[in-house]
């Protein structure tokens, strides 16, 4: 795994500049959409490039039973329907009891719509709650 780390400054409008070496390595172009996941508990932000049309991108926000195989069951449903995971962030809320996952998915090649996948996820015994949101550009 190749990594590059850097310290960047936030400007007065809340923007950061992604270093050129990172933009080139990840293929980030001007005008490209980026998925942003903020974890308030860990005080961290994950930024991932989106290489598909924004109308095909959805966010699944799930609460799961925190046990081995829970995440595999969720990703199995996504894979079965050819929903491509762009980025994901999962954390244990209460170890051995509950976990939270945010999964951003490209639905452009999926054989079903996002609501169908949401219903299938809700039927899994390891899923406590599923919230679905269409990823929208804001700027």
Task: List where the protein language model places each region.
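A conserved regulatory-domain signal marking ACT and ACT-like small-molecule sensing domains
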Residues: 50-139
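Regulatory modules associated with amino-acid/nitrogen control
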Residues: 1-60, 70-75, 130-139
